[in-house]
């Protein structure tokens, strides 16, 4: 038998192939217009698709349902029960915006609401995307769509860079200096700030670092020369760091997938291990809503 292992970046270029069986891991990554060409231009007798979470985009969901309707689902808590992954504990800790941050957040959030109303207030994301993709859209429609997306980015930036997250992060770290900790920030620059706040015990691992820098950070973390590895998205998937036993999440997104992936870094099975995950979030903000949604189907979640 011949087994070929290939990534989506290469698979979509294939044409005219016929496979007995195609297995797609992380299928949510293979559903874009470009990558789905593999399924259009090749044949297969059987198809198995796997993902930690179904895609949240309606179009991608429709594509996946046509390719491979869901026939089996297993939850993280069921995996813990079966001994597939280690037990976990998630603790959600609120932080407050400082005075000027709170003023800026309120101002931007009010503008966000204004632009959302201009878009009709119903599925504003889809409407804004439609407007910007339609050359016949009016100037007022384009202004509303651009304003909507701009305020989303501005609002998230205030949350991502909330100064009290660094203060709380340092406090948590110095109470857990014996742990091997993965830290996740919401933006690369803020991830660097988290890293610098406890230097020299941490190194950063994200897309702005060179391959040499990332390899060194990963190696020093594995050997124990540092006990904290700070990342943004680069460690969300594809890396197995079995000796990490604590995670501190300092940046939440609207996508539940990133939360599941980050938790996944900490629950890789290891005898006697309990994945300890601490999530810092800005209280009474959009971040709190995202976190509530991302953890709603998990059992062992503690809100402080």
Task: Describe the residue ranges of each PLM region.
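Conserved segment of the helicase C-terminal RecA-like domain
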Residues: 265-294
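Structural recognition of the conserved hydrophobic beta-strand(s) that form the central parallel beta-sheet
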Residues: 4-7, 45-53, 228-231
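Inter-Walker segment of RecA-like/P-loop motor cores
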Residues: 1-16
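Conserved helicase ATPase core of P-loop NTP-dependent helicases/translocases
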Residues: 1-4, 180-184, 189-239, 258-260
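Catalytic P-loop NTPase motifs of RecA-like helicase/translocase cores
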Residues: 29-31, 56-57, 238, 256, ...
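Interdomain linker/hinge connecting the two RecA-like lobes of the SF2 helicase core
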Residues: 77-181, 185-186, 194-196
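Post-DEXD/H (motif II) to motif III coupling segment of the RecA-like Helicase ATP-binding lobe
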Residues: 28-89
């Amino acid at each position: 038998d011949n087994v070929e292992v290939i990534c989506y970046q290469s698979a979509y270029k294939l044409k005219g192939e016929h496979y007995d069986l195609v297995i797609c891991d992380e299928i949510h990554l293979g559903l874009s217009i470009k990558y789905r060409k593999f399924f259009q231009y090749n044949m297969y007798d059987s198809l198995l698709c796997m993902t930690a979470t179904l895609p949240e985009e309606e179009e991608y969901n429709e594509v996946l349902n046509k390719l491979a309707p869901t026939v089996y689902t297993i939850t993280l808590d069921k995996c813990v029960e079966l001994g597939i992954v280690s037990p976990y504990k998630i603790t959600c800790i609120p932080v407050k915006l400082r005075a000027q941050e709170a003023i800026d957040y309120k101002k931007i959030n009010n503008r966000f609401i204004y632009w959302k109303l201009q878009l009709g207030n119903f599925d504003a994301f889809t409407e804004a995307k439609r407007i910007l993709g339609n050359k016949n859209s009016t100037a007022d429609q384009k202004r509303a769509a651009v304003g909507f997306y701009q305020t989303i980015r501005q609002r998230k930036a205030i949350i991502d860079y909330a100064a009290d997250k660094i203060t709380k992060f340092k406090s948590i770290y110095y109470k857990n200096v014996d742990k091997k900790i993965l830290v996740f920030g919401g933006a690369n620059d803020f991830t660097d700030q988290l890293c610098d706040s406890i230097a020299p015990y941490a190194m950063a691992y994200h897309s702005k670092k060179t391959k040499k820098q990332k390899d060194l950070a990963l190696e020093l973390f594995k050997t124990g020369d540092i006990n904290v590895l700070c990342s943004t998205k680069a460690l969300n998937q594809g890396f197995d760091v079995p000796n990490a036993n604590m995670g501190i999440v300092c940046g939440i997104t609207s996508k539940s997938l990133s939360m599941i992936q980050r938790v996944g870094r900490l629950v890789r099975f290891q005898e006697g291990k309990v994945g300890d995950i601490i999530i810092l979030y800005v209280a009474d903000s959009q971040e709190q809503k995202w976190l509530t949604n991302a953890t709603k189907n998990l059992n062992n979640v503690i809100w402080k």
